[in-house]
Amino acid sequence: MRLSHLLLPAAALALAPALSGCGTDSLPPTADAAWYIQMIQTGTCQIQGHDDQLGAVTSTDRTKVITDQVDGGNVTCTVSGTGKFDVSATTTYKDLSLSVNISGLSKSATADKPVKGNVTYASTKTIAPYAGECQFFFEGTKEAIAAGKVWVSFICEPGLTNSSSATGSTCEVKTGYLLLENCETEVTAEE
């Protein structure tokens, strides 16, 4: 065997790590989410009060997230802006679904001065989707917002309404937490 036949493959192997990044874009991190919702039975609410969660999150602890396209989870989200942020997200996992749209959410939002946004929530416990306006705010020291991520609390008073109900079932969300990470930072044409 000639020496030149051995040197060419060895040289190619030596250069492979240096050339592996050429001409390729690195993939962005995969979006992930967690949320908790406590719906209570008040007024015209026609379903039993209950808690539901995707992953595990509170205002102070982030224990588990659901990652887009892992184990059947779907997370699509955008958190864009500077100073004031627009948040758009749809999360689904098994029988759980939560969609959120918030305009102008800033770090200064408090329980006394929240920012309004829209929520649509569904699970086997609600039978059909409930939707309505909610109030979003930051509590605790860990909740925050920046381009591509948000961790925020919310309540929905007077509540979310099931529009398919003949009598208009409206149920209050007493406590809610939303965590979104690795989201898009710019609104795309499809949104």
Predicted features, each with a name:
Residues 1, 55-59, 74-76, 87, ...:
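Generic low-polarity alpha-helical segments
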Residues 1-9:
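Bacterial N-terminal signal peptides that target proteins for export
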Residues 9-12, 16:
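Domain-scale selection of a single, long terminal region
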Residues 23-131:
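An ectodomain-focused feature that recognizes extracytoplasmic/extracellular
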